[in-house]
Each structure stands twice: as C-alpha cells, then as structure tokens.
Amino acid sequence: MPMKPINPSQFPKPIAPYSAGAMADNVVYVSGTLALGEGGQVLHVGDAKAQTRHVLETIKTTLEAAGGGMADITFNHIFVKSWDDYKAINEVYAEYFPGDKPARYCIQCGLVKPELLVEIASIAHLSPKE
C-alpha cells in the first residue's frame, strides 16, 4: 500500500524535507515532534512541562488529521536532553495516556537546538475504515 503524507494545514511548513506524519495501511508514523513555532523558534524555553504538552498536542493534531487519536498510539520514542526533566515530562505524559499505556523507550541525548528539552515520535495503529 502506498504511503500517504499527513501535514495538518495549521502546522508551519517543515524546515526540513519530511512530513509531520505518514500513513501506510492503518499505521500512522508521527515524525519526531519538538516544541517549535513558525520559522523554527523554540517555544517554552526552559519549561519541560510546557514543551512536552506542546509536543503531545502536536502529535494529537497529526493523528486527528489521519482519523485517529492518542488512544491509537502503540509506541512512543522519547528523547530527553536531561534526566533532570524526566519527572516533569512523565507528569504531562501521564495526562495524555490515562488508561492503558503505549510501549515506549526514553533516551537521553542532545537535540537539534540547545533550548529543546524533549522530542517524541509515535506509532499509532488505527482501526480499519468501513
């Protein structure tokens, strides 16, 4: 089955050659998502909770554009700049996954801009359309 790009119209144009998400069959792959605004400026500098909320809202919007939602996520890839922010990131994360939790991993690493604190990429499996 061919891949269908997902680029919600309210998102700024990506600053690199990628789509916000891609769907093949009923699987949605959401690109690594950061707290970036128009023109690539970092949002919520120094605030891990606000950056995490922005990232998860962006992922939610991408999934909704594909016909799904947060409950369809089966796996999250989480990248954190510092373990000092791990607790704050998890507090916000838990708000978006109150029931069954998707599988995930979390890696500490450098991100594309020094002010960024968290990046999340997701995989979601949508129910087949009738």
Swiss-Prot record:
It comes from the Bacteria. Its EC number is 3.5.-.-. GO terms for cellular component: cytosol. It catalyses: (Z)-3-aminoacrylate + H2O + H(+) = 3-oxopropanoate + NH4(+). One of its GO terms (molecular function) is deaminase activity. Keywords: Hydrolase. The keyword Hydrolase applies. Disulfide bonds: none annotated. CDD domains: YjgF_YER057c_UK114_family (cd00448). Gene3D superfamilies: RutC-like. Signal peptide: none annotated. One of its GO terms (biological process) is uracil catabolic process. Belongs to the RutC family. PANTHER family: 2-IMINOBUTANOATE/2-IMINOPROPANOATE DEAMINASE RIDA, PROTEIN HMF1-RELATED. Involved in pyrimidine catabolism. Catalyzes the deamination of 3-aminoacrylate to malonic semialdehyde, a reaction that can also occur spontaneously. RutC may facilitate the reaction and modulate the metabolic fitness, rather than catalyzing essential functions. This is 3-aminoacrylate deaminase RutC. It comes from Haliangium ochraceum (strain DSM 14365 / JCM 11303 / SMP-2). The lineage of its organism: Bacteria, Pseudomonadati, Myxococcota, Polyangia, Haliangiales.
